Amino acid sequence: MKLGISAYGAYVPQYRIKVEEIAKVWGDDADDYRNGLMVSEKSVPDVDEDTATIAVEAARNAIARGADPKKIGAIYVGSESHPYAVKPTATIVAAAIGAPNRMTAADFEFACKAGTAAIQTSMGVVASGLAETALAIGADTSQGAPGDALEYTAAAGGAAFVISKNDHIAVINHTCSFTSDTPDFWRREGADYPRHGGRFTGDPGYFKHVLSASRMMLECQGTKPSDYNYAVFHQPNGKFPTRAALTLGFKKEQLSPGLTCPMMGNTYSGASMVGLSAVLDIAKPGERIFVTSFGSGAGSDSFDITVTDRITEVQDLAPKTWDYIKKAKYLDYASYARHKGKINTDN
């Protein structure tokens, strides 16, 4: 039995702030961050946007690409920034897209890989027959404390994928995961901003898990990097996925179509999924996609995906990912702080 993606959609808020604008406020060297992180600007949610609205927009774009909301039997939303501690984002999405009441829904958390965990769970639910189709979403309005290095990259956006047994635009050939207890990045209940281990987030966190899961996938599938047309890795910045890709033997040409972070920042649970959406926007039938996510705490999910002939029928039915990214309105730091709730405007 083949499982795959039958529809997809992404959404990125239109507002941006440049690295220079943030650096100016904190007295930092913008070039150090731009070159060190390989990020020029990041997306910023509007004052009335949150993870729920982003998830809804991404889901609506997936519906526009041919998914029937009445056939969706499960909705899972992965995020680090669900708007409610007790009230699922997934039920908000279900109501907004007109999904039936006879369904299951849940919110997921696993740092930046909660969205790909939602894809894997959707695959299991569909394979078991409990749902005809399932909707998996990764979305975030990422947090970064004022003046922290995370503030240069923590962004907003998300992507949605409908998983089914039929009508695939892309077949998921295999998925596998690598997981360990690694405290590289965390946020306690009630805290406004996450804390992180600085450089500890690199080799012991990101690279150990991304490289291990990726090598596991290549070994399981008996493939090599040259067998794939595209490669997408979790992108907390532009530097990490580039290093991971080159270490594994992928080329920059395979990576660049899905490398969205340099122009929109790190969307946390949406990062690898927005990258996959960008690749599906341009992919051709028969092309193969390699995807590996990463979530602090820590774990990585890898996917081997083959695009089908149906992809050309749906690509132009909803806004494309890079169209969202290129549609930018720039903010100064004061406006950005208001949009992000860093300034309390309540009387």
UniProtKB/Swiss-Prot annotation:
Its UniProt entry gives the catalysed reaction(s) as: acetoacetyl-CoA + acetyl-CoA + H2O = (3S)-3-hydroxy-3-methylglutaryl-CoA + CoA + H(+)
Q: Where is the active site?
A: 80 (proton donor/acceptor), 112 (acyl-thioester intermediate), 234 (proton donor/acceptor)
Q: Which GO terms describe its biological process?
A: farnesyl diphosphate biosynthetic process, mevalonate pathway; isopentenyl diphosphate biosynthetic process, mevalonate pathway
Phosphoprotein: present as a keyword of the record? no
Per UniProt, where does (3S)-3-hydroxy-3-methylglutaryl-CoA bind?
29-30, 112, 153, 201, 234, 243, 266, 296
- Gene3D superfamilies according to UniProt: 3.40.47.10
Binding residue positions for CoA: 199, 239
Q: What is its EC number?
A: 2.3.3.10
The pathway that the record names for this protein is:
Metabolic intermediate biosynthesis; (R)-mevalonate biosynthesis; (R)-mevalonate from acetyl-CoA: step 2/3
GO molecular function per UniProt: acetyl-CoA C-acetyltransferase activity; hydroxymethylglutaryl-CoA synthase activity
Give start-end of the signal peptide.
none
Keyword terms of this UniProt record = Acyltransferase, Isoprene biosynthesis, Transferase
Which Pfam families does the UniProt entry name for this protein?
ACP_syn_III_C
* Family assignment from sequence similarity: Belongs to the thiolase-like superfamily. Archaeal HMG-CoA synthase family.
Q: Which PANTHER family match?
A: 3-HYDROXY-3-METHYLGLUTARYL COENZYME A SYNTHASE, HYDROXYMETHYLGLUTARYL-COA SYNTHASE
Q: What is the protein's quaternary organization? A: Interacts with acetoacetyl-CoA thiolase that catalyzes the precedent step in the pathway and with a DUF35 protein. The acetoacetyl-CoA thiolase/HMG-CoA synthase complex channels the intermediate via a fused CoA-binding site, which allows for efficient coupling of the endergonic thiolase reaction with the exergonic HMGCS reaction.
Q: What does this protein do?
A: Catalyzes the condensation of acetyl-CoA with acetoacetyl-CoA to form 3-hydroxy-3-methylglutaryl-CoA (HMG-CoA). Functions in the mevalonate (MVA) pathway leading to isopentenyl diphosphate (IPP), a key precursor for the biosynthesis of isoprenoid compounds that are building blocks of archaeal membrane lipids.
Its name, as the record gives it, is Hydroxymethylglutaryl-CoA synthase
What is the species of this protein? Methanocella arvoryzae (strain DSM 22066 / NBRC 105507 / MRE50)
